[in-house]
Amino acid sequence: KNHGYTLSAIEEDGFEKIHQIDALGTDDSQKGISISYANTILKFADFWQNNSFDLVCCLGDRFEMSAAVQASIPFGVKLAHIHGGETTLGAIDNVYRHQITLASQLHFVSTLDYKKKVEELTGTLENIYDVGALSLDNIPNFQPIEKMSFLEAFQIKNEDYVLVTFHPETVAVDSNITYAKQMIAALAELTKMLNIVITMPNADTLGSVYRKQIYQLKKTHPGKIVLVENFGKVNYFYLYYQILI
């Protein structure tokens, strides 16, 4: 609910049996994220106790995914990690990603360099496959949707616009207050020339700092700012297809 009902996209793809685990709190401070991490481990301890699978696929580097994986280790769950070996600057994602890699038995990486990193982490050359980035397969198959239907669905004007996506700083966390103010000041200047479409922050440390500033910007410039919690894959691709900046 807090991030645009992304579960609906999974249901629309035809997946019927979806296990839902509610473990995340609304506090996105450092302590709040840590508590959410711990709660996720506790919830998944029950999940792994009551469910078994031949293979579990783990995508990426989210702290929620890391917590689920950590809970699986005592149960000997066989894991396949997608997008291991990568490096993220300005975020603590590397720690979560490498944790998942070390717990996994199969690895599907997106480049040869990332394959080498997984080899370093695991100490073996076995079961590491350079398959490329999975999302790239969606791009050649992308078909532009009808423009006016898209604009009406998200209440975007049929004019030039800027797309803004900002990930909170999760290494130097206290810098987010300054970064948020700088971002909003820059966007306020852009409203003099262009419309702005902002994708809202996700569940990362101090994402609420940006939300507060973004809501204030929207209040100050209601006719120039559009806020979107969840575009979904096709709509986000289309946004890039039409984008000015």
Feature-to-residue mapping (PLM):
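Conserved nucleotide-sugar phosphate-binding/catalytic loop shared by glycosyltransferases and other
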Residues: 1-36, 43
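Short N-terminal targeting/anchoring amphipathic segment
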Residues: 48-62
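A donor-sugar binding/catalytic signature common to diverse glycosyltransferases
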Residues: 58-59, 66, 81-82, 107, ...
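A nucleotide-sugar donor-handling region in carbohydrate enzymes
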Residues: 1-4, 103-178
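Active-site proximal beta-strand in glycosyltransferases
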Residues: 71-85
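A conserved, positively charged/aromatic
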Residues: 88-105
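Short glycine/serine/threonine-rich phosphate/pyrophosphate-binding segments
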Residues: 62-69, 115
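Donor-nucleotide binding loops and adjacent catalytic segments primarily
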Residues: 7-10, 145-241
